């Protein structure tokens, strides 16, 4: 195996198929690390992959960049395929319009997505490492911190969240702005707070009229711009 640009279609779940861009080192061994890169609202997974490949090329890293297509995954940043279809059976918090538990809503929940992709790559390429690192930008940053909160695995070793437009806080308010009545256990919360993570912000990202900035009531309560939030 050589370090190179690769693409596959992932379909081993009940959600819509996705394209995954990835690269492999010369040899996959016990020291090989795995890095996920989650795109923003532009959905340009290939360009994110290309930029990161400049840094991972010739290193013992498997770089993985899934693409959550806008037509098929309009609400990926909130950890569901489509919030209009998010209600599922057995969810006590359906009033929020979201059902994040895959056992109750397997075709729409993304809280098992990274885990399933990681397991697939581990099996396909005989990866011995059982943890991964993950980076998300903008909408991808929203996806990452929500995945850390509600995901179905605890294998993220490190996480970087860059320039999210708004956040889910550990507050007693409705999801996706808070965690009121959401399925997060005490053990999961302890793990979430123990993950080595970094939040990246641009100190000049202060335009309250940015066309890509969410400006509903819940978002505005977090601040007037990305930097404040």
Which residues are covered by each model-predicted region?
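The feature captures the conserved acid-bearing segment of alpha/beta-hydrolase catalytic domains
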Residues: 157-229
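A domain-start/cap signature at the N-terminus of enzymes
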Residues: 1-34, 44-47, 55-62, 86, ...
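The serine-hydrolase catalytic nucleophile loop
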Residues: 45-52, 68, 211
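Active-site glycine-rich loops that stabilize anionic/oxyanionic intermediates
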Residues: 39-43
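Conserved acidic catalytic loop of the alpha/beta-hydrolase fold
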Residues: 22, 113-130
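A conserved amphipathic alpha-helix that caps or lines the catalytic cleft of carbohydrate-
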Residues: 56, 118, 122, 147-148
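Conserved alpha/beta-hydrolase
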Residues: 59-76
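Short acidic, low-complexity segments enriched in Ser/Thr/Gly/Pro
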Residues: 77-98, 130
């Amino acid at each position: 195996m050589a370090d190179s640009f690769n693409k596959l279609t992932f379909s081993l779940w009940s959600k819509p198929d996705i394209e995954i861009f990835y690269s492999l080192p010369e040899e996959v061994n016990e020291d090989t690390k795995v890095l996920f890169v989650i795109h923003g609202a532009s959905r340009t997974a290939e360009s994110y992959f290309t930029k990161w490949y400049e840094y991972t090329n010739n290193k013992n890293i498997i770089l993985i960049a899934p693409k959550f297509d806008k037509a098929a995954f309009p609400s990926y940043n909130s950890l569901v395929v489509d919030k209009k279809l998010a209600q599922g059976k057995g969810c006590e918090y359906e009033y929020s319009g979201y059902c994040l538990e895959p056992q109750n809503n397997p075709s729409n929940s993304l809280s098992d997505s990274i885990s399933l992709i990681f397991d697939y790559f581990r099996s396909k390429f005989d990866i011995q490492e059982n943890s991964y690192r993950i980076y998300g930008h903008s909408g991808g940053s929203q996806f990452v911190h929500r995945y850390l909160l509600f995901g179905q695995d605890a294998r993220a070793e490190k996480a970087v969240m860059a320039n999210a437009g708004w956040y889910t806080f550990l507050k007693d308010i409705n999801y996706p702005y808070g965690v009121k009545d959401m399925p997060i256990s005490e053990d999961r919360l302890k793990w979430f707070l123990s993950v080595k993570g970094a939040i990246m912000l641009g100190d000049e990202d202060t335009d309250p009229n940015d066309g890509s900035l969410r400006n509903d009531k819940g978002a505005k309560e977090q601040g007037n711009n990305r930097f404040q939030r």
